[in-house]
């Protein structure tokens, strides 16, 4: 049984433990889907009950993700795995050795010997194996392209992407005033500006000062505004 002091603490809210309502709000935040930041088209067509990859697949954007096998990508079918392994097993024949192929009864059906061209050795050793780019059985692990369930949303996203433009950066009033003082004192000597202990309080490098002056319009614009 709690004493009166503990009861007063619980009523006054001075305790450090979260209340029952606070615990409910914390559970709601954990179960709540993350906020989607982006275009309105993406927000309207995003299903919070699906995963991110499932939403991209529903919008027809999966092939643009360049999925890798260890990051939730699609795996190869067992037939392709066995076919590639059998090809690799048939291609590997050691020098001076041969592979004997028998039937179910144990009779010799065929003998596969190493190719003379593969047995040739150069003066610096055995030749390197063929490049992986020359092989036709190299898996890409890319998912199969799926049609978009909402082609209008995909067209709107493509239209937004085609109208993208670089963001113009502007110099703030305080930074412009600081650059005017630097140019008034050192003219165009950016090296002296970087070494000035009184004006260069933030220890900006020479390159950072040059970029700031270029963004503000150049030396001439700063001289005229002085």
From Swiss-Prot:
<dbReference type="GO" id="GO:0042273">
    <property type="term" value="P:ribosomal large subunit biogenesis"/>
</dbReference>
<keyword id="KW-0698">rRNA processing</keyword>
<dbReference type="GO" id="GO:0006364">
    <property type="term" value="P:rRNA processing"/>
</dbReference>
<dbReference type="Pfam" id="PF09420">
    <property type="entry name" value="Nop16"/>
</dbReference>
<feature type="region of interest" description="Disordered">
    <location>
        <begin position="118"/>
        <end position="151"/>
    </location>
</feature>
<protein>
    <recommendedName>
        <fullName>Nucleolar protein 16</fullName>
    </recommendedName>
</protein>
<feature type="region of interest" description="Disordered">
    <location>
        <begin position="1"/>
        <end position="23"/>
    </location>
</feature>
<feature type="compositionally biased region" description="Basic residues">
    <location>
        <begin position="1"/>
        <end position="11"/>
    </location>
</feature>
<dbReference type="GO" id="GO:1990904">
    <property type="term" value="C:ribonucleoprotein complex"/>
</dbReference>
<comment type="similarity">
    <text>Belongs to the NOP16 family.</text>
</comment>
<comment type="function">
    <text>Involved in the biogenesis of the 60S ribosomal subunit.</text>
</comment>
<dbReference type="InterPro" id="IPR019002">
    <property type="entry name" value="Ribosome_biogenesis_Nop16"/>
</dbReference>
<keyword id="KW-0539">Nucleus</keyword>
<dbReference type="GO" id="GO:0005730">
    <property type="term" value="C:nucleolus"/>
</dbReference>
<keyword id="KW-0687">Ribonucleoprotein</keyword>
<comment type="subunit">
    <text>Component of the pre-66S ribosomal particle.</text>
</comment>
<keyword id="KW-0690">Ribosome biogenesis</keyword>
<feature type="region of interest" description="Disordered">
    <location>
        <begin position="65"/>
        <end position="90"/>
    </location>
</feature>
């Amino acid at each position: 049984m709690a004493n009166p002091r503990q009861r007063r603490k619980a009523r006054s809210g001075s305790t450090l433990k979260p209340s029952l309502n606070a615990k409910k709000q914390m559970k709601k935040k954990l179960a709540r889907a993350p906020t989607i930041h982006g275009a309105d088209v993406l927000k309207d067509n995003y299903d919070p009950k699906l995963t991110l990859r499932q939403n991209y697949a529903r919008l027809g954007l999966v092939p643009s993700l360049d999925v890798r096998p260890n990051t939730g990508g699609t795996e190869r079918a067992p037939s392709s795995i066995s076919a590639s392994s059998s090809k690799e097993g048939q291609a590997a024949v050691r020098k001076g050795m041969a592979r004997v192929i028998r039937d179910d009864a144990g009779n010799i059906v065929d003998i596969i010997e190493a190719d003379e061209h593969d047995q040739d050795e150069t003066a610096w050793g055995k030749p390197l194996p063929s490049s992986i780019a020359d092989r036709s059985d190299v898996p890409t692990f890319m998912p199969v392209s799926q049609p978009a369930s909402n082609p209008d949303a995909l067209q709107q996203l493509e239209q937004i992407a085609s109208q993208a433009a670089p963001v113009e950066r502007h110099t703030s009033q305080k930074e412009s005033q600081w650059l005017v003082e630097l140019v008034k004192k050192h003219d165009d000597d950016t090296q002296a500006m970087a070494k000035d202990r009184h004006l260069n309080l933030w220890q900006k490098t020479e390159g950072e000062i040059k970029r700031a002056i270029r963004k503000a319009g150049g030396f001439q614009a700063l001289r005229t505004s002085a």
